[in-house]
A protein has these predicted regions:
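Secretory targeting and sorting signals
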Residues: 1-34
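Catalytic cores of phosphodiester-bond hydrolases, prominently lipid phosphodiesterases
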Residues: 2-3, 38-54, 71-74, 78, ...
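Beta-loop motif signature
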Residues: 61
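A structural motif detector for short, solvent-exposed N-terminal "entry" segments of globular domains
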Residues: 65-70
């Protein structure tokens, strides 16, 4: 079965071409002049490192790993999370304000390396992949001031970052989504944005367009009592499936935080129920653990890689 990327995170071919030309320059111009009678590139292929990017893999607090961004990419993740604080004019990345360091910024840890990666991989974060990696920017400091700084910075990367103009999405290799202290009023008023808005379950049914709110995230423990031990109660399973269906019907992707993350059977049980329901992103600090689970237990990833699904543990 041919695997198709989530529609909301697939790069249109014209956007890919524009990105390649802008980022790679003369090399891309030469490539563009070559004959176009070759077969179309598959929707999803292995990267130059032999990895298939994992559609559901979200690196929670990614910056706490030994190699921020790069560890996640080496495990095939397609969504990474960075907490930011506006300090002395810099967007510093850390979980707590006391842990911020000058120079350890959104640009140095994420935007500049991603731009270089896209140049190296000829227009995509993963070679041959037509998707967009999600950069979830969790604003920890004052919302309006920090978003203004984030917006100024993202506009310096027009060929890297997805933008929305007049409600229309122009996909690029990286898509920023603002979480945490979100300045919804300013974001709503912008005619051109370089970031989407991370909604909550309370936003479902409000008619908010996916062009503004591409992602909905919420705290698992505030919605469900089940934490993976024993069978999932049928009422909670039905609730999860309803939430997924409602999110997808509106064009949103869905993520939960505060899910169990110790390497136990409870974590795998919760991940399996989430995959079965169609939750779009699984939240973890354990990069290797989630990669192993998705490559062996997720039918979507198994089909994409062309290998049989392993039996559940």
């Amino acid at each position: 079965m041919t695997y198709l990327l989530k529609t909301s995170r697939r790069l249109p071919s014209l956007a890919i071409a524009a990105t390649v030309l802008a980022l790679v320059g003369p090399l891309a111009t030469v490539a563009a002049a070559a004959p176009s009678n070759e077969p179309a590139t598959p929707a999803r292929t292995a990267s130059s490192r032999g990895l298939w990017p994992l559609e559901r893999a979200h690196a929670h607090n990614d910056y706490e790993h030994a190699r921020p961004l790069f560890d996640a990419l080496d495990h095939g993740f397609t969504s990474v999370e960075a907490d930011v604080w506006l300090q002395d004019g810099e967007l510093r990345v850390a979980h707590d304000e006391s842990a911020t360091q000058p120079g350890r910024t959104l640009q140095s840890l994420y935007l500049d390396p991603l731009r270089q990666r896209v140049r190296t991989e000829h227009g995509s974060v993963y070679a041959g992949w037509h998707g967009s990696v999600q950069l979830l920017i969790d604003v920890k400091s004052d919302g309006p001031a920090t978003y203004a700084a984030v917006d100024r910075v993202l506009r310096q990367y027009p060929d890297l970052m997805t933008r929305w103009t007049g409600g229309r999405e122009h996909m690029r290799p990286v898509t920023a989504v603002i979480s945490g202290n979100r300045d919804r009023e300013v974001m709503t008023a912008q005619t051109t944005r370089y970031a989407g808005y991370d909604g909550r379950l309370s936003d479902l049914g409000t008619g908010t367009p996916a062009s503004f709110m591409p992602l909905v995230s919420d705290n698992w423990t505030q919605q469900f009592t089940w934490l993976g031990v024993g069978p999932m109660p049928s009422a909670e399973r039905e609730k999860l499936h309803r939430i997924v269906a409602q999110s997808h019907a509106a064009g949103y992707t869905l993520r939960f935080w505060a899910t169990p993350d110790l390497a136990t059977s409870a974590r795998e049980s919760l991940w399996r129920e989430s995959v079965a329901a169609g939750v779009d992103y699984l939240n973890t600090d354990d990069l290797a653990g989630l990669e192993s689970f998705l490559r062996t237990q997720d039918p979507q990833e198994s089909r994409a890689q062309g290998r049989p699904l392993h039996a559940a543990a």
